[in-house]
Amino acid sequence: MQKMRTLGEFIVEKQHDFPHASGELSSLLASIRLAAKIVNREINKAGLADIIGASGNDNIQGEEQQKLDLYANEKFKAALEARDQVCGVASEEEDEAVAFSKELNKNAKYVVLMDPLDGSSNIDVNVSVGTIFSIYRRVSPVGTPPTQEDFLQPGNKQVAAGYVIYGSSTMLVYTTGNGVNGFTYDPSLGTFYLSHENMRIPENGKIYSINEGNYIRFPTGVKKYIKFCQENVPEEGRPYTSRYIGSLVADFHRNLLKGGIYLYPSTQSHPNGKLRLLYECNPMAFLIEQAGGLASDGARRIMDIKPTELHQRVPFFVGSKNMVHKVETFLETYPD
């Protein structure tokens, strides 16, 4: 029987893929692993403790913060600061980027951007939620505090990205630019084991994921694409299946495994879409491209967009390559 590889063993193995690697990125990923275990424990007992529901505060986007959002944010920040490989973090839950003040952190080479608990409003009803993270090499001089420019880098500069999905089982999925690998958590041992090696998304899928309750507000091209998905054309595998959980990590994870497309377009009330370029779209774009798929804002590759602000939003279309190409064609054919 083949020995099961742990996440820690796999990270050390893959360190050899990077010439002159000194282990700093490996240590950084280990800190994310630790924080994920802590957050997973709290999520699993959320219904028994006073940590579900709203905190009474809003984040910078005006969205009501959940208690577990804030808990996850603090745990990930603490884990990242403790390892000394990160000079600062930017979080969906923070108004501004946070610079770590310890001298060792100032000498660190990396910054981390994260959505500490995506889909947290679903916890009350026991729906899967997740953590999304993105890692960049800083551009400011080592030994100085991080600057805004360290965080406002296009997605094509990412050195690693991934997510943790807290569901029927807990998984950590990540890439360092050499494919996508998934690890399933064994709570009895407190260990992540390699369970999904070299994950690939099919070029074609049969699932489309979108909140159709907003249909009336969608651009014409998106409306036409939805009708295309619903047409009865058996020889082309249509109609497709509509599956929408409302938790980006959960919808993305299913489509990555099965093949499909996730759509969050612009609407009349949100002309730039609702998802954040830095905390959600860029890391998912890096993952999907490494798995053989595509991510677009409807006209441009997501990872080529130069950010102008920390909490910038963009329309988001991500998934199987041919499905993303198709929705781009509809948006080009039916401009509003």
From Swiss-Prot:
Binding residues for Mg(2+) 2: 115, 118, 280
Tell me yes or no: is tRNA processing among this UniProt entry's keywords: no
Q: Might you give the EC number(s) for this enzyme?
A: 3.1.3.11
SUPFAM superfamilies assigned to the protein according to its UniProt record, in alphabetical order: Carbohydrate phosphatase
Signal peptide annotation: none
Reaction catalysis annotation: beta-D-fructose 1,6-bisphosphate + H2O = beta-D-fructose 6-phosphate + phosphate
Residues given in the record as substrate binding sites = 118-121, 211, 244, 262-264, 274
Cofactor(s) this protein requires: Mg(2+)
- Give the cofactor note text: Binds 2 magnesium ions per subunit.
Q: How does it assemble?
A: Homotetramer.
The UniProt entry, under NCBIfam families, shows:
PRK09293.1-1 (NF006778), PRK09293.1-3 (NF006779)
Family to which the UniProt record says this protein belongs: Belongs to the FBPase class 1 family.
> Which protein is depicted?
Fructose-1,6-bisphosphatase class 1
The source organism is Vibrio cholerae serotype O1 (strain ATCC 39315 / El Tor Inaba N16961)
